[in-house]
Amino acid sequence: MQCIETNNLQQLLEQVKPYTKKGKLATYIPELGNANPDDLGIAIFHKETEYIHAGNSQTLFTLQSISKVITLALALLDRGEEYVFSKVGMEPTGDPFNSIIKLETTSPSKPLNPMINAGALAITSMLEGKDNEEKMERILHFVREITDNPTINYSSKVADSELETAYLNRSLCYYMKQNGIIDCDIEELMDLYTRQCAVEVNCIDLARIGLIFAMDGYDPYKKKQIIPKHITKICKTFMVTCGMYNESGEFAIRVGIPAKSGVAGGIFGCVKGDMGIGIFGPALDANGNSIAGFKILELLSAQEGWSIF
């Protein structure tokens, strides 16, 4: 890490910038279609020397599927492993993240993992709280603590945009309710889920989340354990096997670190015991990952020897 400098990051951004022209915005969520496809930013948060950043690293964007890691950690804290994995599986899937196929063809009929939409919805339904306001406040408090940013909130504009068009997610919920995976009110769950996905961060926030997971839940700046080590281990394992949608296998080969992406263009990754990386690039490849973000992580991993394999 010590050899990575801001100038080096800037050069890498310029090197991969042309890839943004090959990607597309996630226009199926109307608000995400308003992003600038040329935006590209990165931050790296180290355990000792704080962070370096380059490009559009302070532009706000929504977590989207990155929030699945946050809520998984919270659900495991609330309910424990036995309950969580009685409702959601641990296996990767070759299907799209919003597919219903495996719910229909797998026995018992439960989502294969917490990183696909069906699994993430089931996880969100497990969060403790008397109502959605309390549950959302717990999610925000958790994100604020691991980012050390008390100003973090969610975009009601993005949440409303998602809620209006989330027909497929609703169908996943109704199917799971029919099969006893969830038992809550569907519209209440959809409201909470779209809000969790609409939590706004920048690359620096995302890199700090990556650092906490890289340090097995320990915050080296606050000098305290924020997330139990065994929970971060579970989360990082899912990040390796399922974190990059249907490119998780290729990402493991080309980059080789635990990472999670979201369709707003964010990616966060962690290098064990050392650093967290946060990237923003809203131009996506065919699998829903930041096309330039993937490339810059590939180059950095090759340069720095990050791969865990």
Curated annotation (Swiss-Prot):
Substrate binds at residues 65, 117, 162, 169, 193, 245, 263. One of its GO terms (molecular function) is glutaminase activity. InterPro entries: Beta-lactam/transpept-like, Glutaminase. The keyword DNA repair does not apply. Gene3D superfamilies: 1.10.1500.10, DD-peptidase/beta-lactamase superfamily. It catalyses: L-glutamine + H2O = L-glutamate + NH4(+). Its EC number is 3.5.1.2. Pfam families: Glutaminase (PF04960). Coiled coil: none annotated. It comes from the Bacteria. It is an enzyme of class 3 (hydrolase). Keywords: Hydrolase. GO terms for biological process: glutamate biosynthetic process; glutamine catabolic process. NCBIfam families: Gln_ase. Homotetramer. Belongs to the glutaminase family. This is Glutaminase 1. It comes from Bacillus cereus (strain ATCC 14579 / DSM 31 / CCUG 7414 / JCM 2152 / NBRC 15305 / NCIMB 9373 / NCTC 2599 / NRRL B-3711). The gene is glsA1.
